[in-house]
Amino acid sequence: MKKLNFEAPINSLSFGNVSVNFLRVLKQEEIDISLHPIGDQGDFSAFNTIDNDFKQWTSSIAAQRLAKLDKTTPTLKLWHLNGSEKTLGQNQYLYTFYELDSPTVEEVNIVKMQKHVFFSSTEAANTFKQKGCTNVSVVPLGFDPDFKELPKEFDKETIHFGLIGKFERRKNTQALIQLWLNKYGNNPKYQLSCLVNNSFLNQEQMQQAVNSSTMNNHWNNINFLPPLKTNEEVNILMN
């Protein structure tokens, strides 16, 4: 049986969702895994459809990680570039996301010290290849089984837009909302639901961001949703 160290976060954020799906496949392939959780031991609160056997399995492979520690066992790490300079053992393979177009010297060095780096996009991989990194390739993400089409019928008369992701300047959240409002605002044929809560902002800061995005006007076809706690709730929204 092949052995693997898997170092990744288990939580409701984007990296956490990808980590859980990696674990699903690794378990299916019967890989002998030692789980090294980044951060908390494992927060499965968002994964309300996952059975208890899977949760118990992850707890078991996390509890045994130090007893099975071997520097020759390859490691698959799922994390940001910043923080991936720390490795488990001799051969670390990194899966990461990169959203910029100008890698820093530090980022290039971190990539070069990995055995191999898998990026989720071709553009990111090519960007680092141009900086002299020969140990990079592309592995696009697959489909998350938690998200699927539901048999329930929803309103077919209204064209529904969804904006999902933390409210951040780098994501141009405010600009996107205002662009949509300038084109479709108060038009009953269109609806926009925003799931953009940023847990790093307090309630007052978040409200200021919403007010600024709506230009302090009332619009009858835009909704700002509260944080959704489970993938099941997000799936309903996406449907």
Tell me what each language-model feature is.
Residues 9-10, 164-168, 198-199, 228:
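Short donor-sugar binding/catalytic loops of nucleotide-sugar-dependent glycosyltransferases
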Residues 3-5, 44-127, 232-234:
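Extended catalytic core of nucleotide-activated donor transferases of GT-like folds
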Residues 10-13, 23-65, 201:
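N-terminal strand-loop element at the rim of the active site
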Residues 115-126, 133-149:
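Donor nucleotide-sugar binding/catalytic pocket of nucleotide-sugar-dependent glycosyltransferases
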Residues 8-18, 171:
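A short, glycine/small-residue-rich beta-strand->loop->alpha-helix junction that serves as a flexible
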Residues 196, 203-232, 236:
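Nucleotide-activated donor-binding/catalytic signature segment of Leloir-type glycosyltransferases, i.e.
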Residues 4, 154-171, 177-180, 192-194:
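Conserved donor-binding/catalytic core segment of Leloir-type glycosyltransferases
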Residues 105-106, 142-158:
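Acidic anion/phosphate-binding donor-loop and adjacent secondary structure
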